[in-house]
């Protein structure tokens, strides 16, 4: 047994060689909002995986789970004799459940998140914008992308009874804005604070400055800016992008599964060969991209990004009326969420539309 595995075994986070598997409890103490839960190997998480394999040529969800178990064992994250990712996570859940102090449990939650952050980066070393959002490509090519890695990390943490999910990033740690151009995991720790975990960064905990998340009180999506504790990555509260409204951290929730399914289809459309981002868009490519974007909008009509991109694609296809309709709808969604990207103004200008939303931030 390696020193690393021995240390984890002492902490109760993996089982030492020869130990049997504890039976999994039937009830989970973690209470999450509607549509927020997708713990590892649950029906909610497996749907993400099966959707991916449906898009792939061959393979099945069992291939992904088999790869995960093998990679867990090869990395020494799973102790010899257990060999299953699920068993490892369940052992850590049991250890977390024995911690009475919210502060100490929060520290242990962050330690597990950091361990999984390292494991994902080392086991899936290839970051691919083109294909890394498909779970089928984890097993085939060891690829990942920001949405996939964040959903996977959140699912593993949820299985350990940690309140975790995914949020979009519209302003990174350096202050650069984008149109929801990145995804990270959000951990709502037991001591009442939050942290962001980004498997695209060398360090597990990051200080991104603008997020797109779910407001549990208003029941809608909104843009917020985290308020950090000094120079640490600990989030103590949130505020609106104009700093006019202070938002307690508890009502701010991760994005729901409808939104996440929508976002997977958005990336499938965005990365379609011959689509809008291609150097040489084709009629067939644009039609296929529009198909995925419509599927994305259908999964979550309140996700503004696919609505915006659908408007741009339809404009390129010379479907002028439909393009204007989608761009107008996107403008309303962004405005309601509290932030408008400058790219929307440019798209509406190209479509000869009057821009009625507030002045956008650069993106």
Which sequence ranges carry the predicted segments?
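Amphipathic alpha-helical repeat scaffolds of TPR domains
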Residues: 214-278, 302-316, 341-351
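Canonical positions in the second alpha-helix
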Residues: 295-296, 330, 337
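Hydrophobic/aromatic-rich core segments of domains that either
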Residues: 151-222
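Secondary-structure boundary elements
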Residues: 51-138
């Amino acid at each position: 047994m390696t020193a690393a595995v021995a240390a984890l075994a002492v902490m109760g986070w993996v089982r030492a060689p020869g130990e049997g598997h504890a039976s999994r409890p039937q009830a989970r103490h973690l209470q999450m909002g509607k549509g927020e839960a997708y713990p590892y190997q649950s029906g909610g998480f497996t749907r993400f995986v099966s959707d991916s394999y449906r898009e792939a040529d061959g393979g099945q969800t069992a291939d992904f789970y088999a790869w995960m178990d093998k990679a867990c064992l090869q990395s020494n994250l799973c102790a010899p004799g257990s060999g299953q990712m699920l068993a490892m996570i369940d052992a850590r859940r049991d250890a977390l459940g024995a911690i009475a102090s919210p502060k100490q449990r929060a520290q242990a939650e962050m330690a597990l998140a950091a361990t999984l952050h390292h494991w994902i980066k080392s086991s899936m070393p290839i970051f691919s914008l083109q294909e890394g959002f498909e779970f089928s490509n984890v097993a085939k090519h060891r690829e990942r992308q920001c949405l996939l890695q964040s959903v996977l990390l959140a699912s593993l943490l949820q299985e350990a009874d940690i309140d975790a999910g995914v949020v979009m990033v519209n302003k990174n740690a350096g202050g650069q804005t984008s149109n929801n151009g990145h995804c990270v995991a959000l951990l709502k720790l037991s001591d009442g604070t939050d942290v962001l975990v980004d498997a695209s960064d060398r360090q597990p905990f990051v200080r991104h400055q603008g997020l797109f998340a779910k407001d549990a009180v208003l029941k809608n999506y909104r843009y917020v800016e985290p308020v950090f504790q000094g120079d640490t990555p600990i989030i103590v509260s949130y505020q609106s992008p104009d700093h006019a409204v202070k938002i307690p951290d508890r009502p701010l929730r991760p994005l729901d599964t409808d939104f996440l399914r929508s976002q997977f289809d958005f990336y499938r459309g965005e990365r379609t060969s011959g689509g809008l981002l291609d150097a040489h868009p084709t009629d067939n490519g644009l039609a296929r991209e529009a198909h995925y974007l419509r599927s994305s909008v259908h999964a979550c009509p309140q996700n503004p990004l696919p609505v915006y991109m659908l408007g741009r694609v339809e404009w390129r296809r010379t479907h002028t009326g439909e393009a204007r309709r989608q761009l107008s709808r996107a403008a309303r969604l962004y405005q309601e969420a509290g932030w408008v990207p400058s790219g929307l103004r440019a798209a509406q200008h190209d479509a000869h539309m009057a821009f009625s939303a507030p002045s956008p931030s650069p993106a």
